[in-house]
Amino acid sequence: MNLQIKHAIFVLGIFLQVQGIKDTSIKIFSSEIKNIDKTPRIETIESTSTVHKVSTMKRIFDLPKLRTKRSALFPAANICPQESLRQILASLQEYYRLRVCQEVVWEAYRIFLDRIPDTEEYQDWVSLCQKETFCLFDIGKNFSNSQEHLDLLQQRIKQRSFPGRKDETASMETLEAPTEAPVVPTDVSRMSLGPFPLPSDDTDLKEILSVTLKDIQKPTTESKTEPIHVSEFSSEEKVEFSISLPNHRFKAELTNSGSPYYQELVGQSQLQLQKIFKKLPGFGEIRVLGFRPKKEEDGSSSTEIQLMAIFKRDHAEAKSPDSHLLSLDSNKIESERIHHGVIEDKQPETYLTATDLKKLIIQLLDGDLSLVEGKIPFGDEVTGTLFRPVTEPDLPKPLADVTEDATLSPELPFVEPRLEAVDREGSELPGMSSKDSSWSPPVSASISRSENLPSFTPSIFSLDAQSPPPLMTTGPTALIPKPTLPTIDYSTIRQLPLESSHWPASSSDRELITSSHDTIRDLDGMDVSDTPALSEISELSGYDSASGQFLEMTTPIPTVRFITTSSETIATKGQELVVFFSLRVANMPFSYDLFNKSSLEYQALEQRFTDLLVPYLRSNLTGFKQLEILSFRNGSVIVNSKVRFAKAVPYNLTQAVRGVLEDLRSTAAQGLNLEIESYSLDIEPADQADPCKLLDCGKFAQCVKNEWTEEAECRCRQGHESHGTLDYQTLNLCPPGKTCVAGREQATPCRPPDHSTNQAQEPGVKKLRQQNKVVKKRNSKLSAIGFEEFEDQDWEGN
């Protein structure tokens, strides 16, 4: 009996084991069939899967271990009890990013390259995706523009376009016979298009013209192709060329793309060539591919710059064969059709044909004197005559009703300056008499706002021959001439005014009216005529119409402007780059002592942030020069700072500073226990920022911008005046860190808030007195220097 029972159990076990193996084989086979159906295009030879024999009883016992219970809240993630909610959310987001990137990269290889990726390249792409180096759709564009994908498409097009034709075999044999690569002609006019078929009207030319230049000479007689819509191939044209610089010797630093000399030369070359190529329609950008040494005919060594000019094409022009067969007949220019890179969609423009574009590029490169001589002037300034005497025909015609008491328009719009030949012979200043040295202004007329005139406030000059120092006086606005200036449109500027301090005056007694007696002594001998109306005076910088005083005895200077691109930032007029930024520290309490720059708490906090920011900015930003903490504001603690850089840096300044501060924010939060809020980062370049935005003057004062120093200062409001010194009593300026105290009908000194009124004010008073002396001395020097330069250049012939 026992023997029969054992025999029955043995037979049952054998039966269950065989049945389990059969079920496993069926499941594996069915899964393989499904995978093959899902990927019909991938043709790979895979080895037969090895089926491991697993006991049915073992699988039954292992089933509970595999099917672990998931969390009801997060069914796809394992939650550890010791993790916080923030850590759990971060883990889920990281896992989600990983899975999405894996799917994106896998599908990109399947769709565009029709193959399974290698482990190393797959991990590289997944890593780039996780770091957000590429957007998800940018990954697809990168794969679609790869050479492997283009070659695969060309192969598929050939296979599907010529099915079962006998002449296809002969054509393929002809193509495979030669061992040398075909020679591509360098001139469009000599390029043979005879063997190339002319398709019918309903055939998309992009399938035929998307092949490379070496495929053009392949003989074929087919005239029909199956339409394959590939719209991104023809949206841009890239032309490679090189420029030889005979007077620039090649340096070893140019072989390293990370060296400062390499980056500086790249930025300067791009800036100069963009000015030349922007004349061509459709020009997008220019790239520097590298530098290489070149030996000249005389045996000397020179530098050759390899560049690439990119032109944008619209959809209509993409269907023109000439746009794909661009080749320039020049010893310095080579054209190549390249299908790489991410293509940006631009608005359609009017483009020239390939032949016209070739001629224009050659004319630009050969016609530019700097390129012919092998020298590229990497500067924004040109030297030349500063002033051009204006003759009567150059003046605008007066209106029908002209009166002598008419006034000039205070402001005129600005136009882009351009260079024009200067003729100094036989011209005089309007109103100048040859018998005496006095200059009476011509009859002024009302001039309406015009788009062809620069934004200069008109000036009236008068000269007194009897005064020992023949100083020239100016009207409301003036500019100081410099040795080198940007190009100026001489056809529209009647006179380039002299930069000096502007002062109100009376036309009757010609006396200088000002509230500062010290300034009168420094500028003795000046007189001003033709007083503008009070409404016009109020529009000038620093004039308070209520008190009738000039708050700032300065003249507005041209606004600082930065040239900013994706790869560099350059300051114009030889100035340095300046960036203002502010950040908020949430976990730091604010104290009113931080309003006073002389307090110990302010100085300690200033030193703390200086020690934190300066090393980080210096090590991460090329060209960093100085950091200045401007002030602290209430709102936890808001730190307002100013950073100075070199005149040019090889990166986008605003984006680079933001990136460094974002990195610093996370570092400070971890190591220094400073919670710097990300959304509070406010970064502005100096050409766009308002200096008064970062200065807190209190409710009894207002911020005033000093046009000479480009700095912001606090000025007491009317009725809340300062008595610290004679100078600041006149200008009503509070020292930085001081606030004005209320006092009606009597002046009260500018002093800190009530809790710190007993602090000594001597350091601040001395500093302010010294600043005033510097400003007055500068005004006097600039007036004398400006007059001497004007007299030497324009009155020499008279």
From Swiss-Prot:
GO MF entries: chondroitin sulfate binding; heparin binding; hyaluronic acid binding
Ranges of residues in domain SEA: 235-357, 575-688
Alphabetized Pfam families for the sequence: SEA (PF01390)
Tissue expression: Abundantly expressed in the retina (at protein level).
Glycosylation sites: N142, T174, T186, T457, T473, T474, T477, T559, N596, N620, N634, N652
Region described as Disordered: spans on this chain: 424-446, 745-773
Leader sequence segment: 1-20
GO BP: any one term: extracellular matrix organization
Modified how: Highly glycosylated (N- and O-linked carbohydrates and sialic acid).
Compositionally biased intervals (Low complexity): 430-446
PROSITE patterns in UniProt: SEA (PS50024)
Cell compartments where the protein resides: Cell projection, Cilium, Photoreceptor outer segment; Secreted, Extracellular space, Extracellular matrix, Interphotoreceptor matrix; Photoreceptor inner segment
Keywords linked to the UniProt accession: Cell projection, Extracellular matrix, Glycoprotein, Heparin-binding, Hyaluronic acid, Receptor, Repeat, Secreted, Sialic acid, Signal
Family annotation (SMART domains): SEA
Motif Heparin- and hyaluronan-binding: where in chain: 625-633
Cross-referenced InterPro entries: IMPG, SEA_dom, SEA_dom_sf
Claim: Repeat is one of the keywords in the record: yes
GO cellular component: extracellular region; interphotoreceptor matrix; photoreceptor inner segment; photoreceptor outer segment
Biological role: Chondroitin sulfate-, heparin- and hyaluronan-binding protein. May serve to form a basic macromolecular scaffold comprising the insoluble interphotoreceptor matrix.
Protein name per Swiss-Prot or TrEMBL: Interphotoreceptor matrix proteoglycan 1
Source organism per UniProt: Mus musculus
Gene of this entry: Impg1
